[in-house]
Regions:
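Sec/Tat signal peptide C-region and signal peptidase I cleavage site
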Residues: 15-19
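N-terminal structural module
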Residues: 20-70
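Short polybasic amphipathic segments
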Residues: 29-31, 143-146
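Sec-dependent N-terminal signal peptides
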Residues: 4-13
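Cysteine/selenocysteine-centered motifs that mediate thiol-based redox chemistry or coordinate metal-sulfur cofactors
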Residues: 178-188
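Short strand-turn-strand beta-turns centered on an Asx-Gly dipeptide
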Residues: 148-151
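Mid-length scaffold segments of soluble, non-membrane domains
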Residues: 63, 68-141
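Flexible glycine-rich active-site/ligand-binding loops centered on an Asp-His dyad
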Residues: 155-180
Length: 188
């Protein structure tokens, strides 16, 4: 009987170790990006006009320092689990606005063409239902990849400078939402 109970506890522990959840949105606690293993750094809820999405930040190693995360080399992932229906037009405007708020004029000048490509890419996703998952991966030496429900949106967008500008939407000095940033940093 002791062995059965120990096995049951171990099995339950394994199930808990393979997923993290917030607001009913479940994420794997690890991800593979560009051949590298990443771990969930933190989760947060975007709640402008109601709860819109849960975001998960994946990194090679956990960190609670936003500036060092943005500056760090290596693959990264931001996954957004939608809690409400959304559309590409709204997403694209919000992302571009966040990039503009957190980038200098010189940074924006260097990435403006890629921001335009990203804007078009996000608009092309059209309407998305609650429960959909938008994944944004940074793969070093390759680029930024975006997918919705495991379907790629366009081709990769080159340049680490672009991904860093995008990451600052959530982790910059003027993030889209302060408590969302806190959650992604694993501080909530």
């Amino acid at each position: 009987m002791k062995h059965f109970i120990a096995a049951a506890v171990a099995a339950l522990s394994l199930n808990l170790a393979f997923a993290v959840e917030l607001e009913g949105a479940k994420f794997d606690d690890t991800a593979k990006v560009g051949g590298a293993d990443l771990v969930v750094n933190g989760l947060g809820v975007r709640s402008k006009f109601g709860k819109r999405y849960v975001a998960a930040l994946y990194l090679p190693t956990k960190s609670s320092d936003a500036e060092s995360i943005v500056a760090s080399k290596g693959p990264k992932r931001v996954a957004l689990h939608l809690l409400k229906d959304g559309d590409g037009k709204t997403f694209s405007k919000a992302f571009v606005g966040g990039i503009e708020e957190n980038s200098s004029e010189a940074e924006l000048a260097g990435i403006k063409d890629r921001v335009a490509v990203f804007f078009s890419m996000m608009q092309s996703m059209g309407d998305v239902k609650a429960g959909s998952v938008v994944v944004i991966d940074w793969v070093p030496e390759k680029g930024t990849y975006v997918s919705v429900n495991n379907k790629a949106l366009g081709k990769e967008i080159a340049g680490e400078d672009f991904f860093k500008a995008l990451l600052k939407v959530w982790l910059g000095k003027d993030p889209v939402q302060g408590d969302l940033k806190t959650g992604l940093l694993g501080k909530s």
